Amino acid sequence: LGTLFPGLFAVVGPSAGWISFATYGGNPFPAETSPFYWARRSSDTPRYVENLTHRAVYIIHGDADDNVPISQAYTMKGYIEPYVTDLQFHVEPGAGHWWDGDKAGGADCVDWPELFATMDDRRLDPWESEFVFVSPSPWVSPTHSFVTVQSAATPAADLRVTSSQDGDTITVTTDNVRNLTLSAEGLNANEATVVIVDGESYPVGEEDIWIGPAEGKT
C-alpha cells in the first residue's frame, strides 16, 4: 500500500513483511509482455519503491522467522536503499514470526517503540511539489499530490509523473499519461502561478486544470 499510495503515508513500517506473491507464494509473474502480467503488475512491489523517495521506512523482522524468511526483508531493503535515505532496519535476534519482549506494552513485533516514535516525528505534505510518482494504472492508483491521471496511453506500461518547483513555477513531465487533471487547491497551496506540463504552460487560477483529450477512452 505504501508503494502504491505514497500520498497517504509519511512512514511505511513492515514487520515480518513479504515482498510479493511471486517472491513469497512461489507463483512467478508471467512475462512482462503478457496481459496477465499487466493485470498483476500492481502486486510487483519493487517496481514502485521509487514512490517512497521522500518517505520514512522502518523494517522489522526476526532472524529466525520460519513463516516469512528474513531474506524477504533484506531483499526489499536492497530495493529501497537507492531511493530512501530515511531508512531504519531492525533485526530481532532469535525471533520468529511473532515475538515479544519488554520494550512495548503490547507485542514488540507490532508495537515496536522506535517505529511509533518515527511515526510521531514524521509529517506528510499532502500537496508536495517535488516528487516522482509511478503507478501501474489509473484504475489502481490515479492520484498523487495535486495530480490525478484520468487515463493512460496504454495498459502495457506503468504511468509516470515527475514534478519539481522553482519559485512560483511547477514543472510536470509525464510518461504514458493520456490525460490528467491538476488540482487548483494543490497548486495554490504551493503558491504556484504557472504550471508547465510536458513543455506547455498553463496559468494557475481557481479552477482545476484538465490536460489532454476530454473524450474517448477512460
Outline where the language-model segments fall.
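Short glycine-enriched nucleophile-adjacent loop
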Residues: 1-7, 12
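Sec/Tat-exported extracytoplasmic proteins
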Residues: 5, 16, 119-123
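The conserved beta1-alpha1 loop
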Residues: 16, 61, 172
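Short, solvent-exposed loop/turn segments at secondary-structure junctions
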Residues: 19-20, 64-65, 177
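The feature captures the conserved acid-bearing segment of alpha/beta-hydrolase catalytic domains
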Residues: 23-120
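Alpha/beta-hydrolase-fold serine-hydrolase catalytic core, especially in secreted/extracellular enzymes
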Residues: 82-218
